[in-house]
């Protein structure tokens, strides 16, 4: 039977998003790039097979699930494994299958603690266990590449098209013009793809920032509600919350007001 883990609080043992993905990819030999890709449930099923061989029907797991109902089916397999091994944890399937960062990140943080409490270090071949299939669902990757779509890319190249159209009548050889245009399109497509990747990276970092900021804000509210109790522990927490780096200077609140008066 499994060792249950009930703590869900944020501690220094919690991994960051990047470290969590690195652990998952290394353990299961995957190439996940986003926490949201865990919404298919397939990775959790394989981790259960690693911890407790035979606890889940791995043949029923759809490692290349594309649709929400397929994700739900995978989580049903996981729930059956939890029940079989006595894992006292309710899986928020409805939230996880939506692919939201915060819900999936909270669950995988718990699962990592559960894994550490039950893993005995035995060898496991994840590729052979899933018969060589990858768990990155195509529809989870496709929106990332198609999100900007080609119309956005052609918008930046729009000013160049009239120039090409004006030069075409003057040049007797239209074929060379087409070749140059194709080469330019390829270069533009490459740059646009790089921009899109950077935008997605920023988006992920902002989600992670907001996630932890929300937790810090909740802690701050709890401390403020119990401010009059003179609890040394709460006072210490408040000191940590409001502590600043050495040399940090709080901006002068009067400066913005002076700028407003000038207008």
Swiss-Prot record:
Q: What is its main location?
A: cytoplasm
Name the keywords, alphabetized: Cell cycle, Cell division, Cytoplasm, Cytoskeleton, Golgi apparatus, Microtubule, Mitosis
* A GO molecular-function descriptor: microtubule plus-end binding
Region annotation (Disordered) maps to: 150-182
Q: Where do the coiled-coil regions begin and end?
A: none
| Keyword Cytoplasm among record annotations | yes
Identify the Pfam families for this entry: CH, EB1
- EB1 C-terminal domain: which residues? 180-250
Localization recorded for this chain is:
Cytoplasm, Cytoskeleton; Cytoplasm, Cytoskeleton, Microtubule organizing center, Centrosome; Golgi apparatus; Cytoplasm, Cytoskeleton, Spindle
Q: Example GO biological process term?
A: protein localization to astral microtubule
Cellular component annotations (GO), alphabetically ordered: centrosome; cortical microtubule cytoskeleton; Golgi apparatus; microtubule; mitotic spindle pole
Residue limits of the Calponin-homology (CH) domain? Answer: 14-116
Question: What is the annotated role of this protein in its UniProt record?
Answer: Plus-end tracking protein (+TIP) that binds to the plus-end of microtubules and regulates the dynamics of the microtubule cytoskeleton. Promotes cytoplasmic microtubule nucleation and elongation. Involved in mitotic spindle positioning by stabilizing microtubules and promoting dynamic connection between astral microtubules and the cortex during mitotic chromosome segregation.
Q: Which family does it belong to?
A: Belongs to the MAPRE family.
Record-linked PANTHER family: MICROTUBULE-ASSOCIATED PROTEIN RP/EB FAMILY MEMBER (PTHR10623)
Q: What is this protein called?
A: Microtubule-associated protein RP/EB family member 1
According to its UniProt entry, this protein's organism is: Coturnix japonica (Japanese quail)
**What is the name of the gene encoding this protein?**
MAPRE1
């Amino acid at each position: 039977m499994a060792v249950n883990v009930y703590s869900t609080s944020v501690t220094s043992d919690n991994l960051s998003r990047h470290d969590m993905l690195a652990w998952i990819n290394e353990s299961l030999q995957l190439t996940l790039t986003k926490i949201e890709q865990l919404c298919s449930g397939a990775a959790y099923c394989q981790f259960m097979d690693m911890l407790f061989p035979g606890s889940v029907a791995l043949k029923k797991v759809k490692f290349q699930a594309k649709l929400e109902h397929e994700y739900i089916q995978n989580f049903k397999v996981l729930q059956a494994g939890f029940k079989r091994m006595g894992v006292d944890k309710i899986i928020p399937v409805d939230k996880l299958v939506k692919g939201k960062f915060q819900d999936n990140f909270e669950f995988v943080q718990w699962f990592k603690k559960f894994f550490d409490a039950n893993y005995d270090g035995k060898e496991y071949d994840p590729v052979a266990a899933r018969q060589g299939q990858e768990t990155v669902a195509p529809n989870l990757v496709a929106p990332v590449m198609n999100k900007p779509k080609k119309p956005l890319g052609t918008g930046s190249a729009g000013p160049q098209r009239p120039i090409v159209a004006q030069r075409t009548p003057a040049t007797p050889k239209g074929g060379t013009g087409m070749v140059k245009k194709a080469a330019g399109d390829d270069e533009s497509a490459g740059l646009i793809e790089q921009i899109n990747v950077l935008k997605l990276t920023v988006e992920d970092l902002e989600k992670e920032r907001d996630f932890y900021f929300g937790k810090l804000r909740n802690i701050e509210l709890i401390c403020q509600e119990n401010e009059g109790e003179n609890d040394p522990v709460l006072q210490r927490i408040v000191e940590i919350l409001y502590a600043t780096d050495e040399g940090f200077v709080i901006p002068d609140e009067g400066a913005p007001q002076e700028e407003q008066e000038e207008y």
